[in-house]
Amino acid sequence: MNAPAKFSTSQIRSDFLAFFEGKGHTIVPSAPLVPGNDPTLLFTNSGMVQFKDVFLGAEKRSYVRAADVQRCLRAGGKHNDLDSVGYTARHHTFFEMLGNWSFGDYFKKDAIAWAWELLTQVWKLPADRLLVTVYHTDEEAFALWRDVIGIPESRIVRIGDNKGAPYASDNFWQMADTGPCGPCTEIFFDHGDHIAGGPPGSPDEDGDRFIEIWNLVFMQFDRQPDGTLVPLPAPCVDTGMGLERLAAILQHVHTNYEIDLFQTLIGKAGSLTGVADLENKSLRVIADHIRACSFLIVDGVLPSNEGRGYVLRRIIRRALRHGWMLGVRQPFFSKMVPTLVELMGEAYPELVVAKDTVARALSAEEERFAETLDAGMKIFDEVASRSQDIIPGADAFRLYDTYGFPVDLTADIARERGMRVDMEGFEFAMERQRETARAAGKFGGGVALPADLVASMSPTVFLGYEAYDADALKVVAILRQGRPVERAEAGDEVIVFTDRTPFYAESGGQVGDSGQLSGPGVSVEVADTQKFAGQFHGHVGRISEGALALGDVLAGEIDTQRRGKTILNHSATHLLHAALREVLGTHVQQKGSLVAPDRLRFDFSHFQPITADELAVIERKVNAEVRTNHGVEVHNMAMQEALDFGAMALFGEKYGENVRVLKMGGYSTELCGGTHVTRTGDIGLFKITSEGGVSSGVRRIEAVTGQGALDYVADEERRLLEAANLLGGNTTEVVDKVRALTERQKRLERELESLKAKLASGATADLGARAIDVAGVKVVAVRLEGFDAKALRDAMDRLKQQLGDSVIVLAGASGGKVALVAGVNGSPTGKVKAGELLGHIASQIGGKGGGRPDLAQGGGEDGPALATALDGVPLWVKQHLG
């Protein structure tokens, strides 16, 4: 029998897409690893994720046949293969899924025939090495395989309900407990009887001989709440085939790590780590993880301590720890990126575009973890040496909290040593920390609308895009002290709901409007407007006169000056977001914002501080767009239409079917429900006031606009002029004069240190003569005026060299405070401990201190007690020497 031809991973991708394009399929790009249409899903973990709404009938596409190569991730959440990666033949964090789809078009006959054609005619797989499974009641699929394809019945396996319930089977697919579902047929490759394992459905099915390569799902039923299956009017096909395991078969190897793509990555990892054994499991881990980490960063995820960012951090740190195991102590992981780009850049052009961003983000994380990895491993070794088979949860939490060790990394290390982590104890420690954080962060609780009130109201109609005031606003609900009332009186603090309103309710980072509601004999001062249950505008304020009742008709007028300042800042936020992505890279994603009348605050993903030069460029770009005076266009459209229009959606946000798109020239196009200027020139001036870190991987910029920016610049000029006057020059000389002052200060500090050293040297010579002999040990306990802790330590070092076996206590007094240093040198070290001695002295002068057996330091209050404490040192030493 002739061996099948070999195919490269790249060729397999292109063959698959070309084959189905020839069958009338639209080739669809891979969706990002971060699902845009499913907030319940951490990552895209299968090919069907981007088509989920199509199958559910919530979305229409312009095609009925599609094919794609989808990048997928399984690490975190329900689908998590992280612990197995590197140790098994076919587990990966990142993998590619080949898929073809029919949305009410072709069905079983074509799907099966085309799968067989591609496998046996294009890729030349021997038909006698292929075996298929069908759901036990799917007679149609069974007959197609037997009668049309010609597979003997002996190689068609019926799989029943093998998961303990009706339709709970490896060969019956369902999206949820109800909804689209149907049988599937799977194609397996037989590696031969030299490998252990039996066919699917047999007791030995978990062996490695028969490997599933393609799953064809036939969605033909709608499962009802009572469990019955109703035929769908337009059945669909959803197929999935793992690229890596298919490549292993087409390249005549048994494990995925032996295919061309992985062999190149493993070779690069070996070169960077100095490991020649390419079978090393740590090299496999590194090769796998570079794909997952790189594509997560491409898709906008950066390392952080929560959500998707924390999953990325866990994967990176697992790879770094495996590098550490191989003896690597220098950055190496980010150096894998160019090789990955060479291998996968043609298939994924977005990787090529983001390669520098990926490398910088990985490098920054390497540097961050390197600071704690060695120390953390020492702590782990200490814990492991005093534990039996279990790493206590409290210690695992300390490794996580102090040294940045994700708990699954600690579990990984423990497993390698035949141990396990007390996960219950770890979760207890985590929850205790969460409770502490919650307690520290508690403030006045929010108000929730009663369910019956929500059911009785219609969503508030917002008029504020076009109008700053409005009449005929009907009061539909009043809350007083958080409870619905029919009437409220003057002086009452209330939340008023009307059927319509010009007041913007706080959302999307923009603060709510303030202003006034008024009617015959009643006035409400509105301090804020909040959104309740996502659709009702609540006017938060106080009744200043009269009484308010349900059904009253009011007029509303917002504070136009406050709104006017706010819209400048909101529109500037959009320009800032675009400028950040242009200057820093497309990895920048909004992580939070505040748009207030007096300032804007914008939080975004970025892995390092922004330089002064970068900030200057960002500010210039925003102001250039302001001066261009773009018209600001507003478009209302369907979500998919908005994305096709180029609108940027925020990761993690859930949008409705129809969205509002804000476009500023060709520079910024975003989904936004806020209020904005009509032209960018209205912003006037944009000025950044600060930049800093919020958390790991998240930066913050604060800025002002319009008159606020002019006032800020005027204040800066005033301060600069004041500084120039203090320095005795003009504003152009400030930098030079400050530089000269700084250099002079440094010179004086060096001279001062030199004088202190000479003083300490002279004092040391005198102190040696004052030493008292206690049982053959020289004891010195003295007060030194004006000595700081450093000068005391220098004097201590000289005295130890001069005296040999000795116990020394030095007290530096200055400004009513005392710095203490205690040292033990030579023979008394075992009996006299510096930390205990210093603690004994400090306790007598209202202070504290401690340290090592040979050196300790502390402090306290100056006064008569210090002399008494120092005088008692020789006796204390004598008692401890025995």
Swiss-Prot record:
An example of a GO molecular function for this protein is: ATP binding
**From which residue to which does any coiled coil extend?**
none
According to its UniProt record, where is this protein located?
A: Cytoplasm
- Could you tell me the superkingdom of the organism this chain comes from? Bacteria
GO cellular component annotations, sorted alphabetically? cytosol
Cite a single GO BP annotation: negative regulation of DNA-templated transcription
Keywords of the record: Aminoacyl-tRNA synthetase, ATP-binding, Cytoplasm, Ligase, Metal-binding, Nucleotide-binding, Protein biosynthesis, RNA-binding, tRNA-binding, Zinc
**Record-linked InterPro entries:** aa-tRNA-synth_II/BPL/LPL (IPR045864), Ala-tRNA-lgiase_IIc (IPR002318), Ala-tRNA-ligase_IIc_anticod-bd (IPR018162), Ala-tRNA-synth_IIc_core (IPR018165), Ala-tRNA-synth_IIc_N (IPR018164), Ala-tRNA_ligase (IPR050058), Ala_tRNA_ligase_euk/bac (IPR023033), DHHA1_dom (IPR003156)
Q: Name one matching Pfam family.
A: DHHA1
Root EC class: ligase
What cofactor(s) does the depicted protein rely on?
Zn(2+)
Reaction(s) catalyzed by this protein? tRNA(Ala) + L-alanine + ATP = L-alanyl-tRNA(Ala) + AMP + diphosphate
Q: Name the SMART domains for this protein.
A: tRNA_SAD
- Leader sequence residues: none
In which residues is Zn(2+) bound? 570, 574, 672, 676
On cofactor binding, the record's note says: Binds 1 zinc ion per subunit.
**E.C. code:** 6.1.1.7
- Print the domain comment field: Consists of three domains; the N-terminal catalytic domain, the editing domain and the C-terminal C-Ala domain. The editing domain removes incorrectly charged amino acids, while the C-Ala domain, along with tRNA(Ala), serves as a bridge to cooperatively bring together the editing and aminoacylation centers thus stimulating deacylation of misacylated tRNAs.
Q: What does this protein do?
A: Catalyzes the attachment of alanine to tRNA(Ala) in a two-step reaction: alanine is first activated by ATP to form Ala-AMP and then transferred to the acceptor end of tRNA(Ala). Also edits incorrectly charged Ser-tRNA(Ala) and Gly-tRNA(Ala) via its editing domain.
Similarity remark: Belongs to the class-II aminoacyl-tRNA synthetase family.
Name this polypeptide is given:
Alanine--tRNA ligase
Question: Which source organism?
Answer: Xanthomonas axonopodis pv. citri (strain 306)
